[in-house]
């Protein structure tokens, strides 16, 4: 006799004529209609339940309350009758705790007892949904309701916007590293000294101080300047090619460096091509890329939508902001053959015969980042001005543009720019935090003495071709970096982290990309011919300039 329990083989039904069980024993089971939100209030119906006075339908089912819409099949036409469409008041189901207010801290309730709460607005606070409360003479609260956020529930918010990547990731690309923004924000590389000039090229025109007097009562129209700006990448720069033979091991431009150093403030996707040749690393941008376009309202709560044919789409606004920035930086200069120019040691390396180039001075600077990492970058100035002591001060000139304050829910410049310029700048810092941080980093890298910001707005919100200059403002780059909470030690740390990561890899081509929908930086190993098609398209294109229709 075995000590174990006997194993009884179960009976398994086999259906030879179809799927499922062979027999269905439970047929004609009555169905009781119910609602999942009904509250269970009793277990057994031993005695009749005493209804409550306040909530008589506390345990009633909410299924089929509107019986006038129920369908009953009958052949007798005598039951046909007209339905009263005036509507019937449906019995509200009982729901525990729904929209129950805090009776203890209710201003209206406590006001009747003479012990009203203090004015919430005077303490700097506000009620939920943006409603403010105040106390009247007799203690009864008076509420100003803002129904924008009232009744918002979980899952009813606006859907998350899915952004597109700046470059399509191919299947043969190898993912090497993923670094999220919280890790990057903890990095720091302190005690980086000021960059040392190793070459200066080009010439600069002087800034016209008359534009410092521009205000809302004396606005100036923005002109279209027919000047060419060459946006040459790192490996195509002849000066960087010459310097790379004898000095440095990391080479880049100020636009590429500012993009990497301010990556933790970016929301849109971008990418930087990295080429490693022995001990040298070249940071490049892709050919025919949108890298040089300025973003608009990138860090806003509601950034611009991508709508084809709309002047307020993200791409159209980026093109508009780029042209505004180019035109403004050249219009505020003292232009003319008789005007004085500041000449650097070497001529413009991108000068072409018969082409009117924009006023840009290039400074090739060198930084020691430690651990035998020597960075050489091309930086630029837009203008020069004579200081109070007779010394020359270099300027970085940028322009902020307003397109439609009603759509963006921001401060209207034509009402607040002269009286509350700080509020206007704070609104721009909130909506364009990444762009302003990049401009500040570029000015710091170039060693500019001043960062000149211009406020340019559309003449009409529906016309994206005509603009006016409403005012200007200037800052010292280092002080402005402190005001916008830009930590240069952290920016240098982020750059050094990515450089060290590339230095550990074998020779080849890599891609640093900002994830379009996550706060994360990705590093890919890409083939050598990954972007050759973009290079062919770029060689057939022209440098950035103003056309007649822009």
From Swiss-Prot:
Top-rank taxon: Eukaryota
GO process terms (BP): cap-dependent translational initiation; formation of cytoplasmic translation initiation complex; regulation of translational initiation
Region (RNA gate): 290-304
A Pfam family reported for this protein in Swiss-Prot or TrEMBL: eIF-3_zeta
Chief localization: cytoplasm
Biased composition (Low complexity): 115-136
Keyword hit for RNA-binding: yes
Gene Ontology molecular functions: mRNA cap binding; translation initiation factor activity
Keywords (A to Z) from UniProt: Cytoplasm, Initiation factor, Protein biosynthesis, RNA-binding
GO CC annotations on file: eukaryotic 43S preinitiation complex; eukaryotic 48S preinitiation complex; eukaryotic translation initiation factor 3 complex
Region named Disordered: 108-152, 527-550
Cellular compartment(s): Cytoplasm
Protein family: Belongs to the eIF-3 subunit D family.
Subunit structure: Component of the eukaryotic translation initiation factor 3 (eIF-3) complex. The eIF-3 complex interacts with pix.
Annotated function: mRNA cap-binding component of the eukaryotic translation initiation factor 3 (eIF-3) complex, which is involved in protein synthesis of a specialized repertoire of mRNAs and, together with other initiation factors, stimulates binding of mRNA and methionyl-tRNAi to the 40S ribosome. The eIF-3 complex specifically targets and initiates translation of a subset of mRNAs involved in cell proliferation. In the eIF-3 complex, eif3d specifically recognizes and binds the 7-methylguanosine cap of a subset of mRNAs.
PANTHER family: EUKARYOTIC TRANSLATION INITIATION FACTOR 3 SUBUNIT 7, EUKARYOTIC TRANSLATION INITIATION FACTOR 3 SUBUNIT D
Comment block on domains: The RNA gate region regulates mRNA cap recognition to prevent promiscuous mRNA-binding before assembly of eif3d into the full eukaryotic translation initiation factor 3 (eIF-3) complex.
Protein name (record): Eukaryotic translation initiation factor 3 subunit D-2
Record organism: Drosophila sechellia
């Amino acid at each position: 006799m075995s000590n174990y329990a006997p194993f009884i083989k179960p009976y398994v039904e086999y259906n030879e004529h179809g799927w499922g069980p062979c027999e269905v024993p439970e047929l004609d089971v009555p169905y009781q209609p119910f609602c999942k939100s009904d509250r269970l209030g009793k277990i057994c119906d031993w005695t009749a339940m005493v209804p409550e006075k306040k909530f008589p339908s506390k345990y009633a089912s909410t299924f089929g309350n509107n019986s006038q819409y129920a369908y009953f099949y009958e052949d007798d036409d005598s039951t046909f009758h007209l339905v009263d469409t005036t509507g019937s008041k449906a019995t509200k189901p009982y729901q525990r705790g729904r929209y129950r207010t805090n009776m203890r801290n209710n201003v209206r309730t406590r006001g009747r007892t003479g012990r009203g709460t203090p004015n919430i607005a005077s303490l700097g606070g506000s009620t939920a949904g943006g409603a403010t409360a105040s106390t009247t003479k007799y203690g009864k609260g008076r509420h100003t309701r803002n129904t924008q956020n009232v009744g918002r529930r979980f899952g009813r918010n606006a859907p998350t916007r899915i952004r597109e990547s700046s470059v399509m990731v191919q299947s043969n690309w190898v993912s090497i590293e993923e670094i999220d923004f919280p890790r990057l924000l903890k990095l720091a590389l302190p005690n980086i000294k000021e960059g040392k000039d190793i070459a200066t090229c080009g010439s600069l025109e002087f800034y016209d101080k008359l534009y410092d007097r521009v205000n809302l009562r004396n606005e100036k129209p923005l002109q279209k300047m027919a000047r060419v700006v060459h946006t040459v990448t790192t490996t195509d720069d002849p000066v960087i090619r010459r310097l790379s033979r004898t000095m440095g091991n990391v080479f880049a431009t100020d636009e590429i460096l500012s993009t990497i150093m301010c990556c933790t403030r970016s929301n849109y996707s971008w990418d930087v091509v990295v080429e490693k040749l022995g001990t040298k690393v070249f940071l490049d941008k892709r050919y025919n890329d949108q890298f040089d376009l300025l973003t608009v309202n990138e860090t806003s709560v509601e950034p611009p939508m991508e709508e084809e044919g709309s002047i307020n789409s993200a791409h159209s606004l980026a093109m508009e902001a780029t042209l505004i920035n180019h035109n403004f930086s050249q219009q505020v200069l003292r232009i003319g053959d008789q005007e004085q120019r500041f000449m650097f040691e070497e001529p413009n390396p991108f000068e072409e015969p018969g082409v009117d180039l924009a006023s840009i001075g290039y400074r090739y600077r060198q930084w020691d980042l430690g651990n035998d990492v020597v960075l050489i970058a091309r930086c630029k100035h837009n203008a020069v001005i004579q200081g109070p002591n007779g010394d020359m001060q270099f300027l970085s000139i940028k322009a902020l543009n307003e397109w439609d304050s009603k759509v963006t829910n921001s401060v209207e410049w034509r009402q607040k720019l002269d009286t509350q310029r700080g509020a206007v700048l704070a609104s721009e810092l909130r909506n364009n935090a990444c762009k302003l941080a990049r401009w500040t980093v570029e000015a710091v890298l170039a060693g500019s003495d001043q960062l000149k910001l211009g406020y340019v707005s559309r003449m009409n919100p529906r016309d994206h071709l005509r603009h006016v200059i409403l005012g200007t403002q200037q800052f010292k780059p280092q002080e402005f970096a402190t005001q916008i909470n830009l930590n240069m030690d952290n920016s240098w740390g982020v750059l050094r982290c990515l450089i060290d990561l590339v230095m550990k890899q074998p020779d080849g081509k890599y891609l640093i990309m900002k994830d379009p929908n996550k706060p994360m930086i990705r590093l890919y190993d890409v083939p050598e011919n990954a972007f050759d098609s973009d290079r062919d398209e770029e060689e057939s294109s022209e440098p950035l300039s103003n056309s007649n229709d822009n």
